[in-house]
């Protein structure tokens, strides 16, 4: 499972800059690779999720296996939530989903 090392949230974009794999390998991603999207396995050890910058899509399996995640507030800017985006989030007890989804 990948773990986020750094991300850039400027200009209303989420850009994943670096992440590690299960094998400890650090990978870099072009900072323009993702435009306001959350991609697979971006975060793995979070408890509460509130987006303060506009995003448009939460990708497939984006928060899969976030076993400590208890609360998610999705902003109105989101129009798509991918398959299995919150699969195996066993502690998730509160989700706020806007009408835009």
Predicted feature descriptions by range:
Residues 59-62, 82-87:
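Consensus positions within tandem repeat domains that build extended binding/scaffold surfaces
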Residues 7, 11-12, 18, 44-56, ...:
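Structural signature of tandem-repeat unit edges
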Residues 1-7:
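Enriched but not universal
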Residues 22-64:
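LRR flanking "cap" motifs
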């Amino acid at each position: 499972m990948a773990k986020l090392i750094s991300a850039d949230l400027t200009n209303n974009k989420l850009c994943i800059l670096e992440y590690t794999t299960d094998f400890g390998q650090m990978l870099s991603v072009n900072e323009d690779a993702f435009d306001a999207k959350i991609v697979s396995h971006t975060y793995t050890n979070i408890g509460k999720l509130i987006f303060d910058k506009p995003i448009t899509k939460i990708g497939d399996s984006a928060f899969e296996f976030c076993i400590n995640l208890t609360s998610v507030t999705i902003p109105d800017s989101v129009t798509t939530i991918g398959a299995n985006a919150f699969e195996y989030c066993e502690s998730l007890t509160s989700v706020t989903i806007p009408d835009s989804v």
